[in-house]
Amino acid sequence: MTSCAHPHCRSQRNMNTPQKSALVVSAHSADFVWRAGGAIALHAEQGYAMHVVCLSFGERGESAKLWRKGEMTEAKVKDARREEAMAAAEILGASVEFFDIGDYPMRADKDTLFRLADVYRRVQPEFVLSHSLKDPYNYDHPLAMHLAQEARIIAQAEGYKPGEKIVGAPPVYAFEPHQPEQCEWRPDTFLDITSVWDKKYAAIQCMAGQEHLWEYYTRVALQRGVQAKRNVGITSARNIVYAEGLQSVFPRVTENLA
């Protein structure tokens, strides 16, 4: 039996198809922009419901420019960072929520872990993005990844809140840290974000508290773009200019190696 190709029928099938989703676990409220803004915007354009969890606002360690203004309080910094992150998420096409568990140092208890597991259950992500497993310059980042992985495991457990729909085994990717060599991070996946670079850079510009990083992450995207182009072959017709690097945490299961 063949399916109807009429536009109305195709539209009806699309309405009956559940929307795919993905989850980004960001230690601080700007990390998802620098490191995964392209991935978020690209998949949002592909129809994914992209959801970001910011574990903290980065109010202590990631907001130097705001603190230097003087007469600043932690509450004011948090408010500014929240506004920046929400504006960036809107540009990228993502929803965002804030756990506000603090930074420098970041600490997480069992309630935080269960809260994130509940997000997994609610979002049912097709894939997950978070930080590198190591970062000697910022201990908040590996903690975020460990939380992301442990919450994933809990959300897979039948015995956690029995009766709820468990999550499957969404692939987990570590996005690029600030200094990859020291973090023992090596990309095994390049994502072509050329088509959404304008959105990513507009989101980057929302991060007024860390303006010194705007140019740096532009250079990172250009560098990864060159490497992505090299890995598809320099004779390829694909015009890759900007890319994001990712490191997969788990093996991928496939039926085709092409």
UniProtKB/Swiss-Prot annotation:
Reported consequences of knocking out the gene: Lacks 4-oxalmesaconate hydratase activity.
Domain of life of the source: Bacteria
Keyword Transcription applies: no
Activity as a function of temperature: Optimum temperature is 30 degrees Celsius.
Catalytic activity: 2-hydroxy-4-oxobutane-1,2,4-tricarboxylate = 4-carboxy-2-hydroxy-cis,cis-muconate + H2O
Cofactor binding note: Binds 1 zinc ion per subunit.
pH dependence: Optimum pH is 7.0.
GO molecular function terms listed in the Swiss-Prot or TrEMBL record: 4-oxalmesaconate hydratase activity; hydrolase activity, acting on carbon-nitrogen (but not peptide) bonds, in linear amides; metal ion binding
Keywords: Aromatic hydrocarbons catabolism, Lyase, Metal-binding, Zinc
One record GO biological process: gallate catabolic process
Record flagged with keyword Phosphoprotein: no
Residues involved in Zn(2+) binding: 28, 31, 141
Cofactor(s) recorded in Swiss-Prot or TrEMBL: Zn(2+)
One protein family per Pfam: PIG-L
EC number(s) per entry: 4.2.1.83
Residue pairs linked by disulfide bridges in the UniProt entry: none
Enzyme class, spelled out: lyase
Family: Belongs to the MshB deacetylase family.
Name of protein: 4-oxalmesaconate hydratase
Species assigned in the record: Pseudomonas putida (strain ATCC 47054 / DSM 6125 / CFBP 8728 / NCIMB 11950 / KT2440)
Lineage, highest ranks first: Bacteria, Pseudomonadati, Pseudomonadota, Gammaproteobacteria, Pseudomonadales
Gene coding for it: galB
